[in-house]
A protein has these predicted regions:
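DPxDG-like acidic metal-binding loop motif
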Residues: 1-20
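Buried hydrophobic packing segments
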Residues: 10-14, 31-32, 122, 126
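Surface "functional belts" at beta-alpha junctions
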Residues: 20-117, 131, 145, 150-151
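Acyltransferase
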Residues: 110-167
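General helical structural elements
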Residues: 9, 16, 52-53, 151, ...
Length: 167
């Protein structure tokens, strides 16, 4: 959370000074753009507690097939069964997903060097956003966390407990 905020502040400052629009590239899109071929790619980052941040993309066109989400790894089952094959998983959650679904038909292991987030994937996803005219002003560039930070979750739990105690 903090690293993302610091990175966004740096990008926004540079873009504002240069009067340049920003491409808000999701991590899942950057992972997907780092590989090519036929079939489907799922960008998956380990969100801990048996969950992954994930999104599905067409491997040939990199067209987004699902929104970014934070869900239990088992929640991908319907998408995994129905998507175009072959299917590969990339990101630091790739092994978790692959081990969960490797017995499904059409699931392929991804070579380790292609599983990591690479600058080329970020650049290609950003260029696609530029070409599509979906870049935004620095003021409009905002983080998308997909879930509350641990500190925010703990505060909400304390507030709920206090609310229950006063009722």
């Amino acid at each position: 959370f903090t690293g993302l905020r610091i990175g966004l502040a740096a990008v926004k400052g540079l873009a504002f000074a240069a009067n340049t629009p920003c491409a808000g590239v999701s991590t899942m899109a950057a992972l997907a753009y780092g590989v090519c071929g036929e079939g489907t790619v799922i960008g998956a980052q380990d969100a801990r507690r048996g969950q992954v941040y994930w999104a599905g993309f067409d491997l040939a066109t990199h067209a987004r097939l699902t929104p970014d989400a934070a869900e239990p790894v088992t929640a991908l089952e319907a998408f995994v069964k129905e998507c175009k094959k072959p299917l590969i998983f990339v990101g630091d959650g790739a092994a978790l997903c692959y081990n969960t679904y490797k017995d499904q038909p059409g699931i392929l292991p991804c070579p380790q060097p292609l599983r990591v987030l690479r600058g080329a994937g970020v650049a290609l996803a950003g260029k696609a956003m530029w070409d599509a005219g979906t870049c935004v002003s620095p003021a409009e560039l905002l983080p998308d966390y997909h879930r509350l930070s641990q500190a925010e979750r703990e505060r909400a739990e304390r507030e709920a407990a206090q609310q229950s105690a006063t009722n």
